[in-house]
Structure formats: structure tokens, C-alpha cells
Amino acid sequence: MKKFTILKGIAAVIPDINIDTDAIIPKQFLKTIHRKGLGKSLFYNERYTEGYNKNLDFILNKDPWSNSSIIIAGENFGCGSSREHAPWALLDFGIQCIISNSFADIFFNNSVKNGLLLIKLNKNEIEILNELAMKKESFSVDLINQKISVKNNEINFNIDPIIKDRLIHGYDDIEITLKNKQLIVDYENNKNKFHIWKNIVNEKQ
């Protein structure tokens, strides 16, 4: 998985609330298990009018936001059904960070596991960033120091230290398991000491 330390780029504002996973990547594009190519169909119903004819009113079809690496989204982003294709499509398009007031839990977990940084900020901070994004200002997202810098503005953000470590080092689930292999082996070898009730049941039998 790609390491995330500092991201510099343009941010696109998509302010609608409750953008669900079907809006992010509609169900007809879920037949593949390949991550590459899904970015073309990201926000399909909003980006295109018919077939793949671009809707020029949609922000990701406008310059410079067509090259965005950051989205500033409305609250409860990623609600709806669980589909890992949603973060796949975002990443394949080039989005590496999403900033919002809140995210759906399942989407949040799927995103973290795929290396997509999700940042929660309060509404006032979101409004400040929205205004700067619409002015086409360049954003810097520093995960190591947990801060967003835009022009003369700096906003700090909180993140779970485990998630932070995972993203900075680019660990996927398999790499995390291998990293903790000895702890897992030790636990398996000693688990009966922790599960006393098993010993009691075995003695009664």
C-alpha cells in the first residue's frame, strides 16, 4: 500500500450531505475485482449526462479541480451499502484525502484499509477550507504533524495513532498481521492461561 506522509494538491468541494456509496460508484460498476479503471466511473451519475459525456457543471469536470487529490465533502460521506469499490474508485481517480464533518463507519474503515486518509473537522473549519478551495488555493496535508496548510491558514486535525502509523508506513492488513506475527504466536501458545473457563470445562469432562 502506498505510504502517506505529506500531500500537496488542489481540493474539490462536494458539499452535498449523505453522499452514499452508490453515488460514489454505482452498482453497475461493481462486477470487477480489479481496482484499476474504476476512477473513470467515480460519481458517474453526476459527472456524466449520458454514457460518458461530461457534465461540465460538475466540479471534477472543471479545471483545476479535474486534477484534485483532495475532496472536501458534506457530512455523513460514504453512507449506504458497504462496497470497497468506493475507496478504490476514489484512489484510482487520484483522490488521496477526504475532509468532512463526519463519515459513515463502514466507509471509513474500508478507506483506511486501502490507504485513503479521511480527516474529520468541525463545521467552521470546513467552511474556511471550502472558501479557500473555491479560490483554487493549493492545499498541503501533513499527516506526520497532523495539520492542513492553505495559504496563511493552518488547521490541526486529530487521528487515531494506529491509523496514522498504518498510513504513514503503508501497511495493509497482511503486512500488519506479519508485523505482529510473534505476538499472535505467543498468544496462541498461551491462550489457555487467559481462558480459565476452558480449563474448568475440560476438567469437568
What is each residue range found by the language model?
Residues 1-74, 78-79, 85-205:
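Cytosolic catalytic domains that perform sulfur/thiol-centered chemistry
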